[in-house]
Amino acid sequence: MSSVKRKQPPATLLQRRVRPRYEPEPESDVEEMSDAPSEEGAGFDSEDEEMSEAEMRSGSDEENSELGSDPEDGEDESEDDTPQPTHQLSFGALAKAQAALGDKLNKRKRRSSSAASEASSSRDNSNNDNKFSLEKNHKKPLEKPSRTSKHAPVELSSKRQVSRRRDFLLDPTSTKPQHRDPRFFAPSTMSATSKIDEIKARKAYAFLDEYREKEMQELRVAIKKSKNAEEKEKLQKALLSMESKKKAQERKDKAQKVLDEHKKKEKELVRQGKNPFYLKRSEQKKRVVVETFKGMKKGQVDRAIERRRKKVAGKEKKLLPWARRTVEDR
């Protein structure tokens, strides 16, 4: 054993464990050790002394860096401001750096989460304000129409909400539905029920024909008195429209009269025990035509037949295909 005495480190350094840095030994040292085995003891002792001194120095440096009491460290730090490479740093310094970075990241996350929570709370408050304003502006539901007694008619308001669509450029007749009064206009669909309703309405409001006749007479007088050409033309068109409607209604009344007479006869035959006979559409038209020609003179009948022939011929021509052009036509 060598007689060299080792220096004892302080008690604080003995309690602290520091892992030595691994450094590969040069090949020359290994060869010397193999050549001189007699000097192993002395070499080991000197190396142990150097390691102990390095440990003491590193421990004292770490303590000074932790406590911050040694003034010489500030001078060393000011002198060595250049960053050291990571492979030369100790594990303690790396751990401290990682802890510091983790604290910074946690602070950033907390700030972002707090900002997001504030934004969501502000959005919720704005939504609540909007809901409150909508509920405030929302009108109360309208009261249901009431009546004084169960026999009295229901009182309804004549007010109607104006449409927000600006359809002044459109044709009102094509877009807006036209309201129809069943007393004056026949229903568009001629089903069995609508036909019955039309007959009932015609019988119930037959007195309107007298009013229409008076209106036509007033129009004739106004046409004679008017001197404005445009106004006179409008009055003539209105008179012509009313006259055509009157003639069409008379034709319908005659056709309905023929059917009513046939039904009356069939009812009497059914009472006698015979089977009912229903007229076809074609037979109904024939009987209506015969009934209209009965009250006409010969010249009137000829003119009516000619008009009917031209009408049928025009319909047939519309159904025919267009003639192909030939070389002569070119």
Curated annotation (Swiss-Prot):
Kindly give the InterPro entries that the UniProt entry links to this protein: RRP36
Biased region (Basic and acidic residues) positions are: 132-146, 243-264
* Protein localization: Nucleus, Nucleolus
Q: What does this protein do?
A: Component of the 90S pre-ribosome involved in the maturation of rRNAs. Required for early cleavages of the pre-RNAs in the 40S ribosomal subunit maturation pathway.
Recorded coiled-coil stretches: 212-272
Q: What's a single GO CC term here?
A: nucleolus
Q: Where is this region: Disordered?
A: 1-189, 242-264
Q: Looking at the record's lineage, which domain of life comes first?
A: Eukaryota
The UniProt family comment states: Belongs to the RRP36 family.
What's the protein here called?
Answer: rRNA biogenesis protein RRP36
List GO BP terms, alphabetically: maturation of SSU-rRNA from tricistronic rRNA transcript (SSU-rRNA, 5.8S rRNA, LSU-rRNA)
Report biased composition (Low complexity) as residue ranges: 113-131
- Where's it mainly located? nucleus
Compositionally biased spans, kind Acidic residues? 25-38, 61-82
State whether it acts alone or in a complex, and with which partners, per the record.
Answer: Associates with 90S and pre-40S pre-ribosomal particles.
Starting at the broadest rank, the lineage of the source organism is: Eukaryota, Fungi, Dikarya, Ascomycota, Pezizomycotina
Q: Which Pfam families does the record associate with it?
A: RRP36
UniProt entry keywords in alphabetical sequence: Coiled coil, Nucleus, Ribonucleoprotein, Ribosome biogenesis, rRNA processing
